[in-house]
Every structure is written in structure tokens, then in C-alpha cells.
């Protein structure tokens, strides 16, 4: 595993950035597809996509920095080093919402209609982005006993752990609640590998990738075809589906941002779900 997919002299191109670029391209393409289906202004959709992407990136980065402020105060040059990772998806959502509200006010359009366009592209883009997290060895899960793992850097500590596990009886192995057949051992140069060298971890970022793909299927192939949708119908369902996904994945993640003694993603996700359900029930007007 190597976070760099291409190196030309001193210039390094990272998978992290590549996945974001692919996510942006796919998201904009899907947004334009919806616009054509609904006879919507293509230029407006493209301009909105640009604003949503930029505001989402800024929001995601600021959110992450605020929750890790001591580190960035000591390492201020790392603030702009986004290729090292460090984006918070809830911050990205909040930043995207802020950008949407500003854009909608300038263009004098209902922001919920823009949200309906963005729902499918957003969650698919988030799924693609998790591949970049995997290549960076970040947003990883907790250690797990597992009979199989992808090993990139082996040291005696792992052999001792694995030998002990293999010596257990089948019934004893079944007593481990975290037993899964797909643990991943990351390079020690990565955040996951430096924190848990030579230990198999839950690939939490891949769990989220799968859940987001399922969420995209629900939004794109089921909810999108529902008639008599209210303004924001697709957007609020996107918030609910992604928030549920995030709550599930957070149980496996090890470095989630904390809000007092609670995981910040759990707190924010529950609030977002409650708000979304409220607005879904509030109106039942057809969008388009």
C-alpha cells in the first residue's frame, strides 16, 4: 500500500486527491444528468456544483482543524496540507449547506431544490472518497482478531499475536466479539500503522464505502422515482441515510472526534436525523 500513485521528480500525486477528483467528476456528471431529465438550467447546476464542492472542502477542513486545534497550533503549516488527510465529513456537509444557502439566495432559488439535485451525487462521492482514506491508512477501525488479514509490514509482535490466536480452539475463537474475516494491517508510515503497528484493524473506511453505495442505490433508484415529492425530499433522505451509516461505522472507528464524552459523529448524526424527519413530515408538495 502506497498513498502516492504517481511520482514525477519531486512532485507526488496522491490517491487521496485522485479519489476526490473522481468523486467531483462523477458527482457533477450525475447532477447534469438530473438537470437534463428535469429540463433544468445546466449552467446553474454546474455553478452550484463548484460552490458546493469548494464550500464543502473548506467546511470539512475547518471542522477537522477545530477538533484537533492543539496539533494544528503546533504545526500551522499542516493546515493547508490536505493531501495528508484530515477532512471531517460532517464539516463538509455543514460547509456545503452554507454554500448552498448563499448560492440559492444570490440566484433567488429554493435551496432545497438544489439539495435534491445534490443528494445522489453527494453520497456516491463520499463512497469514492473513502478509497482515498484507505490508501492513506486513515479513518481506520479498532484492532480485531481475524484469521485473515492484508499484511504490509510484518514484525515479531504480529507473529506473537497471530500465533496465539491460531492456538485457540474453535469454540474459544468464537468468544471474540470482534472476529471478522477481513482485518487489515497498515504500513507503519500511515496513521493506522503508526497507532497500531502490525495489528489487524477493522477497515472502517471500507465499511462506510459499502454503506454509502447502498445509500446511493436507495436514493438514486428508489427514492428518486417517487412521485409527489416535497421540496427537499431527496436531500432530507440523504441526510438520514448518511447519518445512519455514520453512526454504524463510528462504532468500529478508533479516532473519531469527541464532543465531551460522546463521539461527535453520533451527536451530530442524531441531531441531523431528528431535523430531517421533522422537515420530511412538514410538507408534501411536489418538487418537479
From Swiss-Prot:
GO cellular component: plasma membrane
Location in the cell: Cell inner membrane
Pfam families: LGT
Keywords on record: Cell inner membrane, Cell membrane, Membrane, Transferase, Transmembrane, Transmembrane helix
Enzyme class name: transferase
GO MF assignments: phosphatidylglycerol-prolipoprotein diacylglyceryl transferase activity
Enzyme Commission identifier(s): 2.5.1.145
Main localisation: membrane
InterPro entries registered for this protein in UniProt: Lgt
Domain of life (superkingdom): Bacteria
HAMAP family attached to this UniProt entry: Lgt
Purpose of the protein: Catalyzes the transfer of the diacylglyceryl group from phosphatidylglycerol to the sulfhydryl group of the N-terminal cysteine of a prolipoprotein, the first step in the formation of mature lipoproteins.
The family this protein is said to belong to: Belongs to the Lgt family.
Protein name per its UniProtKB record: Phosphatidylglycerol--prolipoprotein diacylglyceryl transferase
Species name: Fusobacterium nucleatum subsp. nucleatum (strain ATCC 25586 / DSM 15643 / BCRC 10681 / CIP 101130 / JCM 8532 / KCTC 2640 / LMG 13131 / VPI 4355)
Amino acid at each position: 500500500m502506497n498513498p502516492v500513485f504517481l511520482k514525477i521528480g519531486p512532485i507526488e500525486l496522491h490517491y487521496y486527491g485522485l479519489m476526490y477528483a473522481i468523486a467531483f467528476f462523477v458527482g457533477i456528471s450525475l447532477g447534469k444528468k438530473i438537470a437534463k431529465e428535469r429540463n433544468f438550467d445546466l449552467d446553474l447546476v454546474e455553478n452550484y456544483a463548484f460552490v458546493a464542492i469548494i464550500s464543502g472542502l473548506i467546511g470539512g477542513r475547518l471542522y477537522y482543524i477545530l477538533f484537533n486545534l492543539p496539533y494544528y497550533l503546533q504545526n500551522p503549516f499542516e493546515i493547508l496540507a490536505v493531501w495528508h488527510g484530515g477532512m471531517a465529513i460532517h464539516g463538509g456537509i455543514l460547509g456545503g449547506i452554507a454554500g448552498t444557502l448563499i448560492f440559492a439566495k444570490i440566484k433567488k432559488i429554493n435551496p432545497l431544490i438544489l439539495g435534491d439535485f445534490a443528494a445522489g451525487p453527494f453520497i456516491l462521492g463520499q463512497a469514492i472518497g473513502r478509497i482515498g482514506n484507505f490508501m492513506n491508512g486513515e479513518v481506520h477501525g479498532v484492532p480485531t482478531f481475524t484469521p485473515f488479514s492484508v499484511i504490509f509490514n510484518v514484525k515479531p509482535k504480529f507473529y506473537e499475536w497471530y500465533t496465539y490466536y491460531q492456538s485457540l480452539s474453535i469454540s474459544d475463537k468464537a468468544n471474540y466479539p470482534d472476529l471478522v474475516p477481513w482485518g487489515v494491517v497498515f504500513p507503519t508510515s500511515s496513521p493506522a500503522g503508526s497507532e497500531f503497528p502490525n495489528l489487524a484493524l477493522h477497515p472502517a473506511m471500507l465499511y462506510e464505502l459499502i454503506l454509502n453505495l447502498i445509500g446511493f442505490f436507495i436514493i438514486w433508484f428508489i427514492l428518486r422515482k417517487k412521485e409527489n415529492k416535497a421540496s427537499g425530499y431527496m436531500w432530507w433522505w440523504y441526510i438520514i441515510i448518511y447519518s445512519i451509516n455514520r453512526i454504524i461505522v463510528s462504532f468500529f472507528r478508533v479516532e473519531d472526534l469527541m464532543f465531551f464524552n460522546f463521539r461527535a459523529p453520533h451527536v451530530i448524526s442524531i441531531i441531523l436525523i431528528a431535523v430531517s424527519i421533522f422537515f420530511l413530515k412538514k410538507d408534501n408538495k411536489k418538487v418537479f
